[in-house]
Amino acid sequence: MSIIDNRKAHFDYHIEERYEAGLVLEGWEVKALRAGRGQIKEGYVVVKNAEIFLIGTHISPLPEASTHIHPDPVRTRKLLLHREEIKKLIGKVEQRGYTLVPLNFHYKGGRVKCDIALAKGKKLHDKRETEKKRHWEREKARIMRAGT
C-alpha cells in the first residue's frame, strides 16, 4: 500500500527501471508519514560520494512534535541500496539524459521504503502524445458504455 505517490513522474519521464530503497528517517518523520503529511512531487534523487540522497521531498511535522527538536521539513534524506545497485545506477545516471526520480513511499515490514526509478525526460511532443492516448482511451470507454 502506497503512502505517497508521485503521479507527475509518469507524465514527465519515461520510466526505464524501478528500485526499492530504504530511507533514513527520524522519528517525527515516520509519525508524519503515517498521518499522510508528505509530498514528493518536487523531489529528486542525486548521487554524492557513491551514496544516494533524496532531495526536495517535504514531510510536514505534526503539531504534537517534541519541543526540543526543531524539524526541517525539506531536509536531505539518505537512501539505502545495495552497493551493486548503487554502482549500476551511477553508471546509468552518468549517461546523457538519465535521472533518478522518486515514485512513491510505501511500507514494507513496518519500514518506510521509497521506490525510485531510472528515467529519461520526456520532450514536449511526447507529453502531448501521452495526453492524446489518454484522451482517446477515455473516449473509447465512453463510446463503449453508450453502445451497450
UniProtKB/Swiss-Prot annotation:
Q: Which GO terms describe its molecular function?
A: RNA binding
Key word NAD present in the record?
no
Q: Which GO terms describe its cellular component?
A: cytosol
Query: Any idea which UniProt keywords this protein has?
Result: Cytoplasm, RNA-binding
Q: What Pfam families does UniProt report for this protein, alphabetically?
A: SmpB
Which Gene Ontology terms describe the biological processes this protein takes part in? trans-translation
Chief subcellular location? cytoplasm
Q: Where in the cell is it found?
A: Cytoplasm
Question: What family is this?
Answer: Belongs to the SmpB family.
Briefly, what is this protein's role? Answer: Required for rescue of stalled ribosomes mediated by trans-translation. Binds to transfer-messenger RNA (tmRNA), required for stable association of tmRNA with ribosomes. tmRNA and SmpB together mimic tRNA shape, replacing the anticodon stem-loop with SmpB. tmRNA is encoded by the ssrA gene; the 2 termini fold to resemble tRNA(Ala) and it encodes a 'tag peptide', a short internal open reading frame. During trans-translation Ala-aminoacylated tmRNA acts like a tRNA, entering the A-site of stalled ribosomes, displacing the stalled mRNA.
What is the name attached to this protein's record? SsrA-binding protein
Task: From the UniProt record, report the name of the gene that encodes this protein.
Answer: smpB
